[in-house]
């Protein structure tokens, strides 16, 4: 029995050693050099810095070690630290890349205007559409549509709740007892 355990342990060590040597020969994508950190602090792995924390797509793209937790009201990011407000306000673009040689980051942050990602089709920006009152439907129309949808759902739910009774003949022998 001890020989079997020794051979399994030896095989595992050889496999780990082979994997380590292969990992050392594969090129690693460029990441920012780790800064000396204080004892107990956690260095966040980021590829860029978002100009707005409300832009969830940008936060998810830029912060590589973020943990997303599903909550009833929203998807809340954990593991974020707040950058200085001056820097956040001064960013004219969606985000700023830490490495100029990261093509995916450059495409995401600089070539695609982030206001167009949330814009109402056919308008310049969401704010302009609401200020001009040129939304696709007025508030009254939306309210009416919601009422119709709600009434339809209530009607459908009531139809589903009605028990289906089997029709019995009136001359059943069980009733005559």
Swiss-Prot record:
It comes from the Eukaryota. It holds the Pfam family Endothelin. One of its GO terms (cellular component) is extracellular space. The record marks 68-69 as: Cleavage. Residues 155-177 are annotated as: Disordered. InterPro entries: Endothelin, Endothelin_toxin_CS, Endothln-like_toxin. Residues 24-45, 69-177 form a propeptide. Coiled coil: none annotated. It is found in: Secreted. Expressed in various organs including heart, lung, liver, kidney, gastrointestinal tract, uterus and ovary, but not in spleen. Within the gastrointestinal tract, gene expression was detected in rumen, a ruminant-specific digestive organ, as well as stomach, duodenum and colon. Disulfide bonds join 48-62, 50-58. Residues 1-23 form the signal peptide. Residues 95-110 are annotated as: Endothelin-like. Keywords: Cleavage on pair of basic residues, Disulfide bond, Secreted, Signal, Vasoactive, Vasoconstrictor. GO terms for biological process: intracellular calcium ion homeostasis; positive regulation of smooth muscle contraction; regulation of systemic arterial blood pressure by endothelin; regulation of vasoconstriction; vein smooth muscle contraction. GO terms for molecular function: endothelin B receptor binding; hormone activity. Transmembrane segments: none annotated. Endothelins are endothelium-derived vasoconstrictor peptides. Belongs to the endothelin/sarafotoxin family. This is Endothelin-2.
